[in-house]
Regions:
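Conserved S/T- and glycine-rich ATP-binding loop of Class I adenylate-forming
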Residues: 1-4, 37, 42, 91, ...
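Alpha-helix/helix-capping structural signal
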Residues: 16, 96, 176-177
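Adenylate-forming
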Residues: 10, 21-25, 100-105, 182-184, ...
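Short, surface-exposed connector motifs at secondary-structure boundaries
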Residues: 5-7, 34-36, 162-169
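Conserved AMP-binding/adenylation subdomain of ANL enzymes
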Residues: 19-36, 43-146, 150-157
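Conserved AMP-binding/adenylate-forming
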Residues: 128, 145-232
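Short aromatic/basic micro-patch
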Residues: 12, 92, 224
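Conserved AMP-binding A3 loop
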Residues: 2-22
Length: 232
């Protein structure tokens, strides 16, 4: 980690560090044993270990990894096919990966012609208004937009989600600050990207937004895990 002092260094993480962070993480997210995930991120970091592997193991859920190709580029090309095969319920993401997903979605929409592209843009803008900052989704007069957003979800956004296997409910984002615009985009298409915050020294999760109890807001790093004390 380059963590708190900017000089890269090794961090000693004990077995109990890991099991404690698993217990803490499960205070903010529920993982049914039927859940599946596909690990796309590098396997040599504690974020992928805790949120990708260990909380799934603790809950009896299923984990898959990307099929290794003959070259790094071939491995990357396996990701879309592996997502469709595994049909994950959630995925781990970092900003660079989220941007790439969005770029591919927009390229696919653009290929369907100008009418579909304009309709998709209008649907996005409508969903942005309805969702506001996530936490205040559909509040006040915005409730009137619910039928329109529901229709757009049925005819447009659901088809986008099918490219992710059709079962994807949310992303868990970490590694760096996730742009609020990216959060708005994925929230609009029905796959919220829940930003978290952590440090390698903390094994690593400290706080996160969550689908549980509607604990999420764009631009926020969410609620502290429990039990955990934080000093600034």
């Amino acid at each position: 980690t380059s963590g708190t002092t900017a000089d890269p260094k090794g961090v000693v993480l004990t077995h109990r560090n890991y099991t404690a962070n698993v217990e803490q993480s499960l205070s903010r997210i529920d993982i049914p044993s039927s859940y599946r995930t596909l690990i796309i991120l590098p396997l040599d970091h504690c974020f992928a270990h805790v949120v990708g592997f260990y909380i799934m193991i603790a809950c009896g859920a299923s984990v898959a990894t990307v099929q290794i190709g003959a070259t790094p580029m071939e491995t990357l090309k396996n990701i879309p096919q592996n997502i469709r095969e595994v049909k994950p319920n959630f995925l781990l993401s970092v900003p660079a990966l989220a941007k790439n997903f969005r770029k591919n979605i927009e390229t696919s929409i653009r290929a369907k012609g100008p009418f579909t592209e304009r309709l998709f843009d209008f649907a996005l803008r409508t969903a942005y208004i309805y969702n506001q900052d996530g936490y205040h989704k559909g509040k006040g007069w915005r409730i009137l937009l619910a039928p329109v957003v529901g229709l757009f979800d049925l005819v447009l956004f659901r088809k986008v989600r099918e490219a992710f296997g059709g079962s994807l409910e949310f992303f868990v984002g970490g590694g760096a600050l996730l742009d609020s615009e990216l959060q708005r985009f994925f929230y609009a298409i029905g796959i919220p990207m829940f930003q978290g915050y952590g440090l390698s020294e903390a094994t690593p999760v400290i706080s996160t937004n969550s689908p549980k109890y509607h604990w999420h807001k764009f631009g926020s790093s969410g609620k502290l895990l429990e039990p955990l004390a934080l000093k600034i």
